[in-house]
C-alpha cells in the first residue's frame, strides 16, 4: 500500500492508518494469502511496518506448500508481482473533491500476492533465495533468552 494514492476502488490510505493494527497484531498476526483466498495461505510476513512512502513488507513463501513453490517461481519470472491488502475500515473520511475515501485507521488482517492489485504501484520489488534462507535461519534461532541475576 502506498500512502496518498487512490486505488481502483476509490480508497486512499493515509499515513498512520496501519499503526494501531500493527501494534495489536504484529507481523505474525497478518496472514500471507494468494488472491485474498483464506483457503490458500502461502507463507508468513516477517516484517511489516509503515514508512514515509507506505507499507513495507518482508515475507517468506512456504516451500512446503505447492502454491508457495509456484508463487516463488512466478515471482522470479515476473509472472506475478502484485500485492493487495485485506482490512476492515475503522475510521475513514469522504473526500468529495477527489471522489475518494481517505482511510485513517484500518484493521489489517491479510496481505495477498495478487495478479492485479487495486493500487498499480503495490508491487513486489525483490525476490531472492538468499533472503529466504536468512529468514529460515532467523526463525530457527528463536527468541534471545532473558538474563536473570540469581
Walk through the language-model features, giving the residues of each.
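Short, charged, intrinsically disordered terminal tails
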Residues: 138-150
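Signature of dsDNA virion morphogenesis modules
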Residues: 1-141
Amino acid at each position: 500500500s502506498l500512502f496518498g494514492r487512490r486505488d481502483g476502488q476509490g480508497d486512499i490510505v493515509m499515513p498512520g492508518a496501519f499503526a494501531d493494527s500493527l501494534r495489536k497484531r504484529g507481523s505474525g498476526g497478518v496472514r500471507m494469502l494468494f488472491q485474498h483466498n483464506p483457503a490458500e495461505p502461502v507463507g508468513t510476513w516477517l516484517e511489516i511496518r509503515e514508512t514515509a512512502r507506505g507499507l513495507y513488507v518482508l515475507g517468506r513463501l512456504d516451500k512446503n506448500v505447492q502454491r508457495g513453490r509456484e508463487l516463488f517461481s512466478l515471482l522470479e519470472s515476473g509472472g506475478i508481482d502484485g500485492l493487495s491488502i485485506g482490512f476492515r475500515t475503522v475510521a475513514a473520511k469522504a473526500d468529495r473533491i477527489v471522489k475518494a475515501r481517505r482511510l485513517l485507521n484500518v484493521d489489517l488482517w491479510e496481505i495477498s500476492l495478487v495478479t492485479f492489485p487495486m493500487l498499480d504501484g503495490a508491487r513486489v520489488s525483490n525476490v531472492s533465495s538468499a533472503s529466504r534462507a536468512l529468514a529460515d535461519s532467523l526463525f530457527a534461532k528463536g527468541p534471545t533468552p532473558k538474563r536473570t541475576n540469581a
